[in-house]
Amino acid sequence: QLYIATREQDLRNSSDNSWQSDTIYSDTPHATYQGSEKLKSRTRYYWQVIAWDKTKEHKIISPISSFETAQLNQSDWTGVWITDNHDKDYTPAPMLRKSFIAQDDIQQARLYVSAAAYYKMTLNGKSITSSHLNPGFTHYDKRNLYNTYDVTSQLLKGENVLSAILGNGFYNESAPVATWSYEQARWRNRPRMICEMEILYKNGEKQTIHSDSTWKTSTGPYIQNNIYSGDTYDACLAIAGWDKPGF
């Protein structure tokens, strides 16, 4: 039997805010449960399982564990796709930044981000991930993948800066080093991104920062990039402090 709640204390106290499955009879080490409650986006769920033997005289109670949902529906996104004002043939990589103010007593913060093709994103000058070439390749006119990051520890009280550099990847390939004729792909365009950060404060208030027309744009040291031929980087064009508060 499976027990689920959105607060750990509700699960421990078996309150009305938790719900449970019917007893699932099975001799396999797994079971499928069709919940009566639909999962909500951007929500942490706590769960616990109780298992009995066939006599129902002995039971095992699992520790309480949890999982978290992200953006379950396209309509959950409040951000919009953004890029700079250059066309697809302009080679320097787009740079985007957003300055915002965060209050004290932050409980948690999540960043949801997608790009076509790749993003290199920082918060207050520090990378939000150690991985590269995110997100994965798709047919961009049909489907786009996104990533979720816990950025709680990177937020500051006061001014914060979220910034991104966008790469062409397979979204904006150009001749003569394009593959599979992707320079003629139906989705080809200037790199772009969509993101949304939700900050939850300890008093229950929420703050959302999302991609929109208020973001600042520029170009910098990445004067050319290609998925196969690599990057051309001109350090003389680096903009000191672009991705940090106080710029």
What are these regions (language model features)?
Residues 43-48, 53-55, 68-73, 87, ...:
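Accessory beta-strand-rich segments of carbohydrate-active enzymes
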Residues 4-6, 26, 35, 84, ...:
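Surface-exposed beta-strand edges and flanking loops
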Residues 80-88:
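Short, solvent-exposed loop/edge segments of extracellular or virion-exposed proteins
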